Curated annotation (Swiss-Prot):
Positions contributing to Zn(2+) binding: Q259, H262, D360, H419
NCBIfam families documented for this protein: hisD
Cofactor(s) in the UniProt record: Zn(2+)
Taxonomic lineage of the native organism: Archaea, Methanobacteriati, Methanobacteriota, Stenosarchaea group, Methanomicrobia
Sites where the protein binds substrate: S237, Q259, H262, H327, D360, E414, H419
One BP annotation, GO: L-histidine biosynthetic process
GO cellular component: cytoplasm
Pathway note: Amino-acid biosynthesis; L-histidine biosynthesis; L-histidine from 5-phospho-alpha-D-ribose 1-diphosphate: step 9/9
EC top class named in words: oxidoreductase
Protein name: Histidinol dehydrogenase
Keyword Flavoprotein on entry: no
Disulfide bonds: none
Known catalytic reactions: L-histidinol + 2 NAD(+) + H2O = L-histidine + 2 NADH + 3 H(+)
Annotated source species: Methanosarcina barkeri (strain Fusaro / DSM 804)
């Protein structure tokens, strides 16, 4: 029996609301285990990688790196049609992220003699994590590697868990080739994150680590931020759907199941002002769950699901902004009314024909998104995650003279006499006298 919360939003208890809003938490529960693995990887390098790969992935590897021969075998084993689909998705992803590219350098003249600007510089190295385990995710390789390449990152590596036979799924390797990854390593979980953060005999240290993962991967990313930058916490997947009576119950239910089949910890929520739609979606979810190929995972995930009936569309929007979903679907008669009022969402899908899976694979937007409410403060993966910005100032003597009194006054007020003197020396002052 599938048990999901079905209630009027106004009747949801404080405990039930807290459970909904705190989904994806539990980092503290795995913190000690994660810390131990990271420490071992940092001190023991490749030997720790072998130990934990054998322990967690149940496979013993002599070499972590994927060879060119393995790449060629993977490519030869994929049908031309599937490879074309992969390239088509890659082209859309590349085009969308190219549109985000900033000017390499720009300048403005603030006042005569005062020229200010900004220089955009790509990071030197990035590590992309692509999950494995229950399924392979070549799409995540495209989503992480392509933006890094478009941004101009010099070195991009990929870590992904090995299969039981020690190989990597052929389509994942094909995606790495299509996207332009420099190297792929057969490493998963905490040990993969540690290897990219600290570097080992085999795996190079990177400046930044991006990509989604389970609670262990997310906890590892949070713990290594003192040695490598990360994109954001990206844990179990989630969708929130705002729908009214104009929505199709079968479509809404199928979108709930699409999210639920990711992981038993995935979260799917429908919030609607229509009792009729809510009841219809509930019935349809139960029917589709029984027929689904990944029925057991879906049924487990639906324990985290909810169908909430709101008093108004405004109440739906208010709950959505509080929930800050990874994916937000808007399936209402006036979607622009809702869109204009959305403050917190990782990626937004408007209308009956913009389901989350199209963004997962082929529309071109990025599917690496903040989860667990982090959409309140983080953006989904984009070009700016791979670029840093340096401010520039080019000031003439006359320009500095126009700022002189202001700088001196503020510096002296803060008790920084040498700051003030650094200005005065440019106008004849000799601090040594």
């Amino acid at each position: 029996m599938v048990m999901m919360l079905f209630k009027k939003l106004s009747d949801v208890s404080e405990a039930e609301m807290q459970k909904l809003l705190s989904r994806g938490s539990g980092l503290e529960d795995v913190a000690k285990t994660v810390s131990t693995v990271l420490s071992d990887v940092r001190t023991k390098g490749d030997s720790a990688l072998r130990e934990y790969t054998a322990k967690f992935d149940k496979v013993e590897l002599a070499n972590f790196g994927v060879s060119e021969e393995e790449f060629q075998q993977a490519l030869s084993g994929i049908s031309p049609e599937l490879l074309d689909h992969l390239k088509s998705a890659a082209a859309n992803i590349r085009a969308f992220h190219e549109a985000q590219l900033p000017k390499a350098t720009w300048f403005m003249e603030l006042k005569p003699g005062i020229v200010l600007g900004q220089k955009a510089t790509p990071l030197e190295s990035v590590g992309a994590y692509a999950p494995g385990g229950r399924a392979s995710y070549p799409s995540t390789v495209l989503m992480t590697v392509i933006p890094a390449r478009v941004a101009g990152v010099e070195q991009v590596i990929v870590c992904t868990p090995p299969r039981p036979d020690g190989s990597v799924h052929p389509l994942t390797l094909a995606a790495a080739k299509v996207a332009g990854a420099d190297k792929v390593f057969k490493l998963g979980g905490v040990q993969a994150i540690g290897s990219m953060a600290y570097g080992t005999e085999t795996v190079p240290k990177v400046d930044k680590i991006v990509g989604p993962g389970n609670v262990f991967v997310t906890a590892a990313k949070m713990q290594i931020r003192d040695v490598a930058e990360i994109d954001f916490p990206a844990g179990p997947s989630e969708v929130l759907i705002i729908a009214d009576e104009s929505a199709d119950a079968v479509m809404v239910a199928s979108d709930i199941l699409a999210q639920s089949e990711h992981d038993p910890n995935s979260v799917s929520i429908l919030v609607t002002g229509s009792d009729t739609l809510a009841e219809a979606v509930k019935r349809e979810v139960l029917v589709q769950a029984e027929q689904a190929a990944r029925s057991s995972i879906i049924k487990s995930s639906l324990e985290n699901a909810a169908i909430l009936i709101a008093d108004s569309l405004e109440q739906c929007i208010g709950f959505s902004n509080k929930f800050a979903p990874e994916h937000l679907e808007i399936m209402v008669a006036d979607p622009d009314f809702v869109l204009d009022r959305i403050k917190n969402a990782g990626s937004i899908f408007i209308g009956n024909y913009s389901p989350v899976p199209v963004g997962d694979y082929a529309s071109g937007t990025n599917h690496v998104l903040p989860t667990s409410g982090y959409a309140r403060v983080y953006s989904g993966l984009n070009i700016n995650h791979f670029i840093k910005y340096s401010s520039i100032q080019r000031i003439s003597k006359s320009g500095l003279e126009s700022l002189k009194e202001t700088v001196i006054a503020l510096a002296e007020e803060e008790g920084l006499q040498a700051h003030a003197d650094a200005i005065r020396t440019r106008f004849g002052y000799k601090p040594s006298k």
